[in-house]
UniProtKB/Swiss-Prot annotation:
One of its GO terms (cellular component) is plasma membrane. It comes from Kineococcus radiotolerans (strain ATCC BAA-149 / DSM 14245 / SRS30216). One of its GO terms (biological process) is positive regulation of translation. It is an enzyme of class 3 (hydrolase). GTP binds at residues 29-34, 145-148. It catalyses: GTP + H2O = GDP + phosphate + H(+). GO terms for molecular function: GTP binding; GTPase activity; ribosome binding; translation elongation factor activity. This is Elongation factor 4. Gene3D superfamilies: 3.30.70.240, Elongation factor 4, C-terminal domain, Elongation Factor G (Translational Gtpase), domain 3, P-loop containing nucleotide triphosphate hydrolases, Translation factors. HAMAP family: LepA (MF_00071). Residues 17-198 form the tr-type G domain.
Length: 622
């Protein structure tokens, strides 16, 4: 075993039997980017001077939050038994929002390193990604990471892992990504256990896109895995889903900085540059083939990313609207799953209705808009797409509560998800109670070990998008983990709750909720706004209503001047006259007065926790 290959196989000339394509799959925070760093150092593709932590996570947000958002592919040389091999490592995102990206990255590999934190054990995303890997028939190498931690329990979790995969506990490799212990044996096992790629070198070229990123200077850089045939620079290629034709300006491998090559052969992983400026032209999961000798059959598994969570984003300063539009156009270049359309709100002005893959995606997009483009934004409460069937059989898709049709509705269907919750067994009751409150149905339950349990629920997506995850964490002292997967839709008894200020509807506060929860939502919103709206010269009623029926009401008391201050003693009729006069004035003011909702009230009322906490603080101070 040589720690580093002396003469690494050159791209385009590598025999498939010398290639090993693998990815690292793990739950968030189980240390896959750190392990990738050690591999880069050991194989010598990054020298010690240029090394920095989480080398492959390029975005500031990725580095700060410690999460991987975009997949990366790196070619590393490794010598084993006197033979030099080329290992292609694909670093995958670990978060549930990016499951489609993970599934495409897995389809580009023959094997997967299943990484589990030796201090925390198996988590929900570990399971989800493991099942994805099994669906793709990958060879799985179980690895326990962070064995240098004092809290590590490698023996206990090795047994859990072995039971899950069906291997011996001794087959689980012990590794520390931080110190580098056990990484060399892991690289040897990758060469030994993971099969070499198989493909027909003489067939028409077929390559699968598993990621694409936008580079300011070079346009879109597309990452591909060649399945059959080979690709060479300067030839014309076709994208099979869009039939768009491009010329290959450059082709090469990442090691981990881009290295141009003479082409890519069967089983190789690399990048293509065609000079295209829009990421939507090279869709993740699409098949690339040669234009002169095209393949007739595309690779399976491609689908368009479908937004699952919608939210309105509005600039706090209305004049920033064109800047927000430009910023979204730029982000879209790098994020093919982002969809948006302009919309206007009576309360918030001009903005955009944006579709996201999930809540993390929403947070990241919003944070990038605020940070990279210096925008101040308000986002409305996240909602999911509903399908409303009217009595005249028309079907309307509603992504914004204010578009919810009034009148004769035959049926409303909402998206549902299959959720997997992993938690210590002492918290079963707390988790079940939470899921039942959120209209969940228990589908099954398994004990992974005597103190860890896996619960499978079918839950409406709308119940998860708001604060389900926070609630789950707080009820289980942070030990539970959640993974979910879209599972069709179901009919539900849903209504739209409107919030009226002085009889006028405020569209930003409208929400679609289940009929049983409508009263609770109405009372909460009215109470929250009562604390947030400043007192006016006249009384302001805050009402929550379903259609024309008011279900909750609060009043913001009027500020009044003490008109009797100048009456020292005197007759009661004099006082009454002054009070009546004031009352008349207030009444007149109420008829013509308009309630201005301050910007802070919008922000606080639309963010679930901040407002509640503020209101609690106020009440506590009283």
């Amino acid at each position: 075993m040589s720690p580093m290959a002396t003469d690494a196989p050159a791209p385009a000339a590598t025999a498939p039997e010398l290639l090993r394509n693998f990815c690292i799959i793990a739950h968030i925070d189980h240390g896959k980017s750190t392990l990738a760093d050690r591999m880069l150092q050991l194989t010598g593709v990054v020298d010690a001077r240029a090394m920095r932590a989480q080398y492959l996570d390029r975005m500031d947000i990725e580095r700060e939050r410690g999460i991987t958002i975009k997949s990366q592919a790196v070619r590393m040389p490794w010598g084993y038994d006197g033979t030099d091999y080329a290992l292609n490592m694909i670093d995958t995102p670990g978060h549930v929002d990016f499951t489609y990206e993970v599934s495409r990255s897995l389809a580009a590999c023959e094997g997967a390193v299943l990484l589990v934190d030796a201090a925390q054990g198996i988590e929900a995303q570990t399971l989800a990604n493991l099942y994805l890997a099994m669906e793709n028939d990958l060879t799985i190498i179980p690895v326990l990471n962070k064995i240098d931690l004092p809290a590590a329990q490698p023996e206990k979790f090795a047994e859990e892992l072995a039971k899950l995969i069906g291997c011996e506990p001794d087959d689980c490799l012990r590794v520390s990504g931080k110190t580098g212990v056990g990484v060399e044996p892991l690289l040897d096992q990758i060469v030994r256990q993971i099969p070499a790629p198989v493909g027909d070198a003489d067939a028409p070229a077929r390559a699968m896109i598993f990621d694409s990123v936008y580079d300011t200077y070079r346009g879109v850089v597309t990452y591909v895995r060649v399945i059959d045939g080979n690709l060479s620079p300067r030839e014309k290629i076709v994208m099979m889903s869009t039939r768009a034709t491009h010329e290959l300006l450059e082709i090469g491998v990442s090691s981990p900085e881009p290295v141009p090559s003479k082409g890519l052969g069967v089983g190789e992983v690399g990048y293509l540059i065609t000079g295209v400026k829009d990421v939507r032209q090279s869709k993740v999961g699409d098949t690339v083939t040669n234009a002169a000798k095209p393949s007739t059959k595309a690779l399976g598994g491609y689908r368009d990313p479908k937004p699952m969570v919608f939210s309105g984003l509005y600039p706090i300063d209305g004049s920033d609207y064109p800047l927000l539009r430009d910023a979204l156009d730029k982000l879209k270049l790098n994020d093919a799953a982002l969809s948006y359309e302009p919309e206007t709100s009576v309360a918030l002005g001009f903005g955009f209705r944006i579709g996201f893959l999930g809540l993390l995606h929403l947070e990241i997009v919003r944070e990038r808009l605020e940070r990279e483009f210096n925008l101040d934004l308000i986002s409305t409460a996240p909602s999911v797409p509903y399908e409303v069937t009217l009595e005249d059989k028309r079907v309307v898709e509603v992504t914004n509560p204010s578009e919810f049709p009034e009148g004769k509705i035959a049926e409303v269907r909402e998206p549902v998800v299959r959720a997997t919750v992993l938690a210590p067994s002492e918290f079963i009751g707390a988790v079940m109670e939470l899921c039942q409150q959120r209209r969940g149905e228990l589908q099954g339950m398994d004990y992974l070990s005597e103190d860890r349990v896996e619960m499978r629920y079918r839950l409406p997506l709308a119940e998860i998008v708001f604060d389900f995850f926070d609630q789950l964490k707080s009820r289980t002292r942070g030990y539970a983990s959640l993974d979910y997967d879209v599972d069709g839709d179901q009919a539900a008894d849903l209504v739209k709750v409107d919030v009226l200020l002085q009889g006028e509807q405020v569209d930003a506060f409208s929400q679609i909720v289940h009929r049983e929860k409508a009263y609770g939502y109405g009372v909460m919103m009215a109470g929250k706004l009562k604390d947030l709206i400043p007192r006016q010269q006249f009384e302001v009623p805050i009402q929550a209503a379903i259609g024309a029926r008011v279900i909750a009401r609060e009043n913001v008391r009027a500020i009044r001047k003490d008109v009797l201050a100048k009456c020292y003693g005197g007759d009661i009729t004099r006082k009454r006259k002054l009070l009546e006069k004031q009352k008349e004035g207030k009444k007149r003011m109420k008829m013509v007065g308009r309630v201005e909702v301050p910007q802070e009230a919008f922000i606080a009322a639309l963010s679930s926790d901040a407002a509640g906490d503020k209101a609690k603080d106020k009440n506590a101070k009283k």
